[in-house]
């Protein structure tokens, strides 16, 4: 019930990584890549090791113990856990295979501008995720109480927020070349068309996550699962073909195409569920 703490853990992990890598680049001249791998691997572990004892001291009832294990709930929990696992696995397939496709079909050098543009716009999604993260538990509680008016009012607020996200992304596009120059200098050239493509991608992804977050709170996972698995399977051949035709722009376009059906389905399912018109697969 405290997503802020979870986000703080992730933030500190990233902060530790940044600090250690900065020190590494400033004071170390050998085996930098190897040490970067060590830092990325150890930072989350160190952060969790720092937080977990504190958590169990404050909330002793959360400390793991065999006496709290209830085997009769294993089937229900495993069913729900497997759904989330498959959704995350499909998302991982979509987001992590892009670099491999670019490296294989185009050139390893093209991975750099692709990743820079991706990370630039991904800042928007990170901040938006932090804002909507607390809604998951709140929506779950409201849905069980059948407080649909509260859910609709909250969604209206977040839809207004999404409008400002669109404005923010538009400003980021206008300022992109200046930001790239300040960030990485002039050593890497990032096509403006790639910037536009990632702006579209992040707007689609943010829009989709807005509704998927509410659907997760309502425990409506099946339709999301089916759509994301299909798109995860189609992404690799689609990105491969488009990369051969359009270069890295084609890979970014594939991300947009893969996320668009999810955004549309999530919106339609949310409308059906909140208006109590969902039947069959739309209600699962």
Please provide the spans of the model-predicted regions.
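Membrane-interface junctions at transmembrane-helix termini in multi-pass inner-membrane proteins
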Residues: 1-12, 200-230
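Helix-loop junctions and terminal segments of transmembrane helices
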Residues: 59-60, 122-145, 214-217
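Helix-terminus/linker motif at the lipid-water interface of multi-pass membrane proteins
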Residues: 23-30, 89-123, 141-142, 180-184, ...
């Amino acid at each position: 019930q405290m997503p802020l703490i979870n986000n703080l853990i992730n933030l500190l992990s990233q902060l530790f990584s940044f600090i250690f890598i900065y020190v590494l680049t400033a004071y170390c001249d050998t085996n930098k890549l190897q040490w970067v791998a060590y830092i990325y691997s150890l930072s989350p572990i160190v952060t969790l090791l720092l937080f977990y004892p504190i958590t169990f001291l404050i909330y002793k009832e959360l400390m793991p113990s065999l006496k709290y294990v209830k085997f009769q709930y294993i089937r229900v929990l495993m069913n729900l856990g497997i759904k989330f696992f498959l959704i995350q696995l499909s998302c991982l397939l979509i987001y992590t295979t892009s670099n491999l496709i670019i490296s294989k079909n185009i050139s390893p050098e093209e991975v750099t501008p692709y990743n820079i543009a991706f990370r630039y716009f991904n800042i928007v999604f990170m901040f938006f995720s932090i804002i909507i993260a607390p809604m998951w538990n709140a929506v779950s509680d409201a849905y069980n109480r059948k407080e649909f008016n509260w859910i609709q009012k909250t969604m209206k607020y977040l839809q207004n927020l999404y409008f400002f996200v669109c404005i923010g992304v538009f400003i980021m596009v206008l300022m992109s070349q200046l930001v790239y120059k300040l960030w990485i200098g002039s050593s890497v050239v990032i096509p403006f068309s790639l910037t536009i493509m990632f702006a579209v991608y992040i707007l689609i992804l943010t829009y989709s996550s807005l509704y998927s977050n509410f659907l997760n709170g309502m425990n409506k996972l099946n339709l999301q699962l089916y759509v994301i698995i299909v798109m995860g399977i189609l992404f690799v051949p689609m990105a491969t073909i488009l990369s051969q035709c359009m270069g890295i722009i084609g890979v970014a376009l594939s991300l947009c195409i893969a996320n668009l059906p999810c955004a549309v389905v999530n919106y339609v399912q949310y409308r059906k569920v909140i208006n109590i018109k969902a039947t069959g697969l739309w209600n699962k």
